[in-house]
Design a protein with these regions (language model features):
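Ligand-binding pockets and gating/stacking loops
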Residues: 1-478
Length: 478
């Protein structure tokens, strides 16, 4: 952090240029010149934004490879087998184990996802008309969320002038039981059947987050829409890639007015764009163009074509970097990533497992589901590592975020709703010390989610329909 800058820059400053007579803009990450001299707040006194996210995966966990041998902080506890990929970011992890769903009226994937994300509700099913194989119409149930999911509650409270009120991404399309209804494919809900669909290909994410023609429209969301409209469809990939050249003159002019550290940060920002020009096409096996560079302060990646499931790791890591870029540029303060849906039947050829994940969990208790869980956690860990490597003010994006890592059930074989393991990542703007395993047997999941809302600054005293509580968990930081 430089104590003095030649120029103060607005937090909403964008590099600008023109392509064929069309004005273009490129967001900047948080620079020292936007902050006070300590890098702890914006220059006008406004606090650096703290973001909240949910990282969800389907089909639960196997506690034998998920539970540390000891609780405590620092070196008193060690990462269990399936969380080993978090070693580089263990200092930002708060692992909470032993939590229960006490008011367990029902057991199952749909009920679990309602509970851990929206506090549960006794009326999950809506009737929908279907057609059977004989062409006869009948009514069947479809599960949905009857309460807003916690990310949307937090988004309502935190949103000010960020371009996106919340942003939803995902990885694996849902292939499970159709009775899962809207909760099978969609994490974020604002009410019954009012969901915000996750974006699952890098091209769509680019279009909505990093418009080359104009900044995204404020707000975002809507029933099934999933966010603000993207750039016009007739803007070609070639044109988008040339945006970097269009704004280069403005970037060089700005660098002349800034200190050395901010100049380096802008260089890294531009290098990051070049790096993703390679990353996204290569994820499809098509090759790329341009140079390489750090993603440390990248803010505006190029467009990408869809990535196939066979390239799942490349796709996942690309989406992670796009999401971190959005956070570093303060495009949103609330995000969710739905790796897979509850009761997901996805296969994992990337780790030589071609059977369905859900079927493995109800099989002979072999290693297959444990290996899938380990792979999924490696991708969650990748997101945290990119956040730690991305500066924000005097710290990093990981310092200024809080992620609720959760699945809908605990042990999946019997749909157990006891001994949930929640993987929290980030320091929540300095409110969570991290590097801690907190064992709280018999405590309610709703207590944890209420605590997360209060950490994010919400004035809420109780939460939940099932297991409604006003009790919180100071054990996370004391």
């Amino acid at each position: 952090m430089e104590l003095l800058n030649k120029l103060r820059v607005s937090r909403r400053f964008a590099l600008r240029g023109a392509l064929g007579g069309i004005g273009v803009a490129m967001w900047l990450p948080v620079l020292d010149a936007m902050c006070n001299n300590n890098g702890t707040a914006f220059a006008q006194g406004e606090a650096l934004p703290t973001s909240f996210g949910i990282w969800f995966w389907g089909n639960g966990i196997h506690t034998d490879v998920w539970t540390p041998k000891a609780a405590g902080s620092g070196d008193a506890w060690q990462l269990p087998t399936n969380l080993q990929d978090f070693a580089e970011v263990k200092d930002a992890m708060t692992l909470v184990t032993g939590l229960d769903m006490l008011d367990a009226k029902f057991k199952g994937h749909g009920w679990g996802v309602a509970y851990v994300l929206a506090g549960g509700d006794g009326n999950l099913c809506s009737l929908t008309s279907d057609i059977d194989r004989g062409g006869n119409q009948f009514e069947t149930s479809r599960q949905t969320q009857y309460q807003p999911t916690v990310d949307q509650t937090i988004a309502d409270a935190l949103h000010t002038n960020e371009p996106f009120k919340s942003y939803e991404t995902g990885m694996i399309p849902f292939t499970g039981d159709v009775a899962m209804g809207t909760v099978g494919s969609n994490l974020a809900h604002r009410g019954p059947s009012n969901f915000l669909a996750p974006r699952r290909d890098p091209k769509a994410i680019f279009d909505e987050l990093f418009s080359a023609v104009a900044p995204p429209a404020p707000g975002g969301g809507g029933s099934g829409a999933g966010g603000s409209a993207g750039v016009p469809s007739d803007i070609s990939f070639k044109t988008r890639r040339s945006v970097l050249d269009a704004v280069m003159q403005d970037a060089n002019r700005l660098k002349m007015t800034l200190g050395a550290e901010d100049s380096k940060r802008i260089d890294a920002h531009m290098d990051g764009i070049r790096e993703l020009e390679n990353r996204i096409p290569n994820a499809n096996g098509t090759g790329g163009a341009g140079g390489t560079g750090s993603t440390g302060t990248m803010c505006t990646p190029p467009e990408a074509p869809p990535v196939t499931l066979a390239d799942i790791t490349a796709k996942s890591q690309t989406i992670n970097r796009l999401l971190v870029a959005a956070l570093s540029c303060n495009l949103t303060r609330v995000y969710s990533h739905m790796w897979s849906g509850p009761r997901s039947d996805s296969s994992y050829p990337v780790i030589q497992l071609n059977g369905a994940h859900h079927a493995y969990t109800h099989g002979d208790d072999g290693q297959e589901p444990r290996k899938i869980e380990r792979y999924i956690m490696s991708q969650y860990a990748d997101l945290a590592k990119v956040m730690k490597a991305t500066p924000m003010g005097a710290g990093t994006v990981l310092d200024k975020t809080l992620i609720y890592g959760v699945s809908e059930v605990a042990e999946p074989h019997d749909h157990v709703m006891k001994n949930y393991h929640m993987v929290l990542m980030g320091h929540g703007g300095g409110k969570l010390p991290g590097n801690r395993h907190v064992r709280l047997p018999g405590r309610k999941v709703t207590e944890l989610v209420l605590t997360l809302q209060q950490i994010m600054g919400l004035n809420v005293e109780s939460w939940g329909s099932w297991d409604r509580t006003s009790k919180t968990m100071p054990e996370l930081w004391t």
